[in-house]
Regions:
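All-alpha RGS (Regulator of G-protein Signaling) helical domain and cognate RGS-like helical scaffolds
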Residues: 1-302
Length: 302
């Protein structure tokens, strides 16, 4: 049975990350608060889900259930130092953060040298580790009442199969989504004040710039440019600051899989880099507005 290129090494990375998270849980029994334990458990489970997927014959197909010749994912066990002694809690957390950062670099390197759904697979794992690094650095692992604006890490969920479309079609879909998002941000801005309004206004400008850049690219390709509808029905009607923030969170979260579609469709290295960065940036914005970090950034969920 064939092995998906790069999956052996990547599965080992994900196993190691799961083991690091298990170590934090093991040595931090008296240090972790309830929220910290939930966070570390979710991180461990996400990495185990990654490793399990990487051990299938085709990790880019969520419907692939058969394991490859690599076998099944082993349970993660706490790591120890060369002397056999477990690290302290703070050191264990630092080791996990460092390992996440290294994993992000390794996965991104694979994404930049592949194309299609393989590029999305590695890009998704890279964004996941990048975002988890940020979450861990900002987390109050010992606190039971964390900052309500801090995002959570979601339990792993099954991916939906991702279609592979021509790059022009992916760019057109991005423009359609950005038209709707610009409209939604304009609604939300009317209910926000102070720093949150400034943040939303900056994101609105960013979306307009991206939409204009993709529009120009489509025109250069002599492709049809989608036009904005006269109005859109928002997923949440922004009646106050709370519902305005919810609308932004929903819009940014919904955009991430379209960025993933664009990443899978990208053909030129520069565009691949741009699309991957957009997956991470959009997810980061959604997270700052309270979204949970999914196990597979850029993929639609089943």
């Amino acid at each position: 049975m064939s092995v998906f290129p790069g999956s052996v090494e990547a599965a080992a990375i994900e196993d190691s990350l799961a083991a690091h998270a298990a170590t934090v849980l093991a040595v931090g029994a008296s240090d972790l608060g309830k929220a910290g334990r939930r966070l570390m458990t979710a991180i461990r489970d996400q990495h185990l889900a990654h490793a399990a997927a990487l051990r299938t014959t085709d990790p880019t197909d969520p419907n692939t259930a058969a394991p490859s010749a690599q076998g099944r994912t082993p349970a993660a066990s706490p790591s120890t130092s060369p002397s056999g002694k477990k690290p302290g809690f703070a050191k264990a957390v630092d080791q996990l953060v460092a390992a996440e950062s290294r994993a992000a670099v390794a996965h991104r390197a694979r994404a930049m040298t592949t194309k299609g759904l393989a590029c999305l697979l590695w890009g998704s794992l890279a964004v996941s580790s990048t975002q988890l690094t940020a979450v861990l650095r900002g987390a109050d692992l010992a606190g039971d009442s964390p900052d309500p604006t801090a995002a959570t890490v979601a339990a792993p969920r099954t991916r939906a199969p991702m279609p592979l479309v021509p790059v022009v079609q992916a760019e057109q879909e991005m423009v359609r989504q950005l038209h709707a998002i610009v409209y939604g941000y304009q609604l939300a801005l009317g209910r926000l004040t102070g720093a949150r309004r400034d943040t939303a206004a900056a994101e609105l400008r960013r979306h307009r710039i991206l939409r204009d850049r993709l529009t120009a690219r489509l025109l250069n390709r002599k492709a049809e440019v989608p036009v904005a509808d006269a109005a859109y029905v928002p997923s949440t009607n922004p009646r106050n600051a709370t519902s305005a923030a919810k609308l932004i969170r929903q819009m940014e979260t919904a955009l991430v899989p379209f960025c993933g579609l664009w990443l899978a469709a990208s053909t030129a290295p520069a565009e691949r880099t741009e699309a991957l960065d957009q997956v991470g940036r959009t997810l980061g914005v959604a997270r700052r507005w309270g979204a949970s970090l999914p196990a597979w950034p850029g993929w639609k969920l089943a």
